[in-house]
Amino acid sequence: MKAMIFAAGLGTRLKPLTDTLPKALVPLAGKTLLQWQIERLKAAGITDIVMNVHHFADKIIDYLRQNDNFGCNIQVSDERDMLLETGGGLRKAQPLITSSPLTSSPNSLITSSPILVCNVDILSNIDIPALLRAYNPEEMGLVVVMPRDTQRYLVFDDTQRLCGWTNIATGEVRGPISNSQYPIANTRNLAFSGMHVLNPRIFSCMDELVALKGEKFSLIDLYVHIAEKEVLRAYIPENYRMMDVGKISQLSEAEAFAASL
């Protein structure tokens, strides 16, 4: 299987570090954020990795070359021309994700292998093999979530199926639950927590949203758009700890968190 690391962000909340570095190369507890992610994937047996780049892309490419890709097969999806958000970024990377790592040909489709998707700036203690075992190839995928305080939530029904999205600060609701006639009972708000396992059929679901929104869209937008027809389920890991290393003020806390993993 392959993994996709989202590493193209501008890292504006990590300024001034990201005035000279891409977010992926911000140092943390003796390693870069990117190295933390690659090593977690490698420890789980995943060595075929695709990652997108935009901000200081050359520095990331040079860093990978200098470190021999950390012993992995890493391919780069170049977004220097346009930052595409998570959904658009995954879509652009499709030829790399669905091709054989030996041939790099998009004609050699890996139709049955799920795609593990993660953010370079989210650290966690997640048990990746357990997550992959929970994946059902008959469904569209799993979204790692947890009950925590935030403003924006994914909404799941009593079978853990995604049925919408809400911003509790503004009252905005999107997805199937926004239809008053939709038969949903016992919904639960859960916060997205940095990782997804997706059926490669996800790529066939993107064209309609691209027609509506253009090439730039988030995976959350895509999930909400397809939730009525496709099954995406919540995955709540046991004893889960995660940290979004998104702000310069959090780096000291993140150092301690990373050291505890």
Residue ranges and their predicted role:
Residues L25, V76-S77, G141, A234:
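Generic preference for hydrophobic
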Residues I126-Y153:
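Conserved donor-nucleotide/metal-binding helix-loop-beta segment in metal-dependent transferases, i.e.
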Residues K2-I5, K31-N119, A130, Q181, ...:
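Conserved N-terminal catalytic core of the sugar/cofactor nucleotidyltransferase
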Residues L10, L21, F56, R80, ...:
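A generic "binding-loop/recognition-motif" signal
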Residues L116, L123, P129-N136, R161-L261:
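Catalytic-core segments of class I nucleotidyltransferases/pyrophosphorylases
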Residues K2-A29, K42-A44, I236:
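Glycine-rich N-terminal loop/short-helix segment of MobA-like nucleotidyltransferase
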Residues R13, K59-D62, T86, K92, ...:
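Phosphate- and divalent-cation-binding pockets in alpha/beta enzyme and binding domains
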Residues Y153-C163:
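Acceptor/aglycone-binding surface of glycosyltransferases and processive sugar-polymer synthases
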